Each structure stands twice: as structure tokens, then as C-alpha cells.
Amino acid sequence: MTPLNIVAQAKAKGLQLIAVTDHNSTLQGPVVRQVCEREGIAVIYGAEITTREEVHCLAYVGSEEQRVELQHYLEKHLPHVPNNPDIFGYQLWVDEHEQVLGEAPYLLISAIDQGIEQVAAFVHSI
């Protein structure tokens, strides 16, 4: 779902706050925030992180700086398994006009090489 669609759905449902939690990525967060601000909706950055135990945990952060730190952590610990768009689809991030800004080179559904305790400790430290 694109940022414009996410925000349109949130607005249609009367939501005042949403969280952006893509699989092992925070790259779409800033654009969702930009679109939300125009619509008067608050947004929390985050990610759905798949740990080495295959636990899917939600991590939330409060600032752009923390989002960037979380993104670097995810990039460092995500296995470099190339994405095959024919099987898993394209992993794109877009701007507020839905123009493609980039494509994640690695499969974002993979588990990172960190356990749930390590993920929790990192998120609490930032």
C-alpha cells in the first residue's frame, strides 16, 4: 500500500494517529509522515522486525533520528539475500507523489541475525 493510500484509509476511518511498521524497513516513514501532516494525522515511526527466532515484533521510535538509527541497524543485520521480484514482488519506496525513490536490494521478509532480546535492547537504547 502506498503512502497516499495509507493516509486516505486512515482519514476515511477517522484515525488521528497511525504507526508505519513495514517489514524490516523504516524507509517509507518520512513520506508517510509528510502526507499525514497535510491531513492532520499524527504518525509514529517503527518497523515489524523478524528476529532470528522468527518472532515478528513491532518496534516504535519517536523521532526521525531514531528512525534512521533503526534503519541502519536493520540494514546491518538483515541477510543480504537478493530479492526476486518475480517471486516476492518489488520492494519499492516512493515519494509523496508516488514516484519511485528506490528499491530495497535485499529480501525484506528475511529474519535478521539478532534475537528478540538483542532487538529489544537496541530499540530501548536509542
Locate predicted features.
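Extended substrate/RNA-proximal surfaces in nucleic-acid metabolism proteins
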Residues: 31-126
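An N-terminally biased module of ancient metal coordination in phosphate/nucleic-acid-related enzymes
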Residues: 1-53
